[in-house]
């Protein structure tokens, strides 16, 4: 595996490749990330991964400085998973001058849910993903369903900007107790880690209620919010939305069997966790 930091060197290395599969990450790789690499290999060759902790998608009070950086461990894991090139640029490589041009998602998708609680987050994501796509020129790119809203925004962005990249969705990988794998799980204390699976269990109860015929979605959302709060969580949102556009479904759409997803974000101690389940 080649480890490259220079954009020009990356382009030189990939010149002539027309089936590249790309997996962008921020590093601190776990089994969830590695499952993306394996899925990428099913859809293209060679597989290119990137590791870049993107300052643009962190808010002023978020964890950019303490976000775990484990490059040497990550390199070993990628080598074991047959990745052809790791693009690991420095901040100077990616942003040699102030990034004045940004890619802004529409408010109806980028300003809700995560976008409401993390202003500027999706503009940072879209900007860096567009720049990475320009560098790698992949045929396909793999994103995880765990970041459901991000997946939808990136997919729509590629469609609307006519980027010739197929976005592949990868299923969320969970620990044995149901907790969705995340680099931020390492922030949890021992007691918090024991409590953390309750987020997924709460979403499962919401899903089961909807599948069982409950149509008062607002009541389900509030019950889930209250349940987590009573256990010491601080929920940002629990929302049942249409999979197609993350808009709340109408009564008619519910009766017609509109595909739904329940999404949640909540703090447990100092750690903010997100999760979702399709319904």
From Swiss-Prot:
* CDD domains given in the database record: PanC
Q: So where does beta-alanine get bound?
A: 57
Which positions bind (R)-pantoate? 57, 150
Catalysed reactions listed for this entry: (R)-pantoate + beta-alanine + ATP = (R)-pantothenate + AMP + diphosphate + H(+)
**One cellular component term from this protein's GO annotations in UniProt:** cytosol
Task: Please name the GO terms that the record assigns under molecular function.
Answer: ATP binding; pantoate-beta-alanine ligase activity
Task: List its EC numbers.
Answer: 6.3.2.1
Catalytic residue list: 33
Q: Where does ATP bind?
A: 26-33, 144-147, 173, 181-184
Q: What does this protein do?
A: Catalyzes the condensation of pantoate with beta-alanine in an ATP-dependent reaction via a pantoyl-adenylate intermediate.
Q: What else is known?
A: The reaction proceeds by a bi uni uni bi ping pong mechanism.
Family of the protein in this entry:
Belongs to the pantothenate synthetase family.
Can you say what this protein is called?
Pantothenate synthetase
């Amino acid at each position: 595996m080649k480890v490259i930091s220079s954009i020009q060197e990356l382009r030189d290395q990939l010149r002539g490749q027309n089936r590249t599969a790309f997996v962008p990450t921020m590093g601190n790789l776990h089994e969830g990330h590695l499952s993306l690499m394996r899925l990428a290999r099913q859809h293209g060759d060679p597989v290119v991964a990137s590791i870049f902790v993107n300052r643009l998608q962190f808010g002023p009070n978020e964890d950019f400085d303490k976000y775990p950086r484990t490059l040497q461990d990550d390199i070993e894991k990628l080598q074991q998973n047959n990745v052809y090139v790791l693009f690991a640029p420095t901040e100077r490589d990616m942003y040699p001058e102030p990034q004045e041009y940004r890619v802004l998602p529409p408010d109806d998708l980028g300003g809700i849910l995560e976008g409401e609680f993390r202003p500027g987050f999706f503009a940072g994501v879209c900007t860096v993903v567009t720049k990475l796509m320009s560098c790698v020129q992949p045929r396909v790119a793999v994103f995880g369903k765990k970041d459901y809203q991000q997946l939808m925004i990136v997919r729509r962005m590629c469609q609307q900007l006519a980027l010739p990249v197929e976005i592949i969705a990868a299923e969320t990988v969970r620990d044995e107790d149901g907790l969705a794998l995340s680099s931020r799980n390492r922030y949890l204390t021992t007691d918090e880690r024991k409590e953390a699976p309750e987020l997924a269990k709460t979403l499962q109860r919401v899903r089961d209620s909807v599948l069982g015929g409950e149509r008062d979605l607002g009541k389900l959302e509030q019950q889930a919010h209250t349940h987590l709060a009573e256990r010491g969580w601080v929920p940002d949102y629990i929302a049942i939305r249409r999979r197609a556009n993350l808009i709340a479904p109408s009564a008619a759409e519910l009766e017609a069997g509109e595909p739904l997803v329940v999404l949640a974000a909540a703090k447990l101690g100092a750690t903010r966790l997100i999760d979702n389940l399709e319904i």
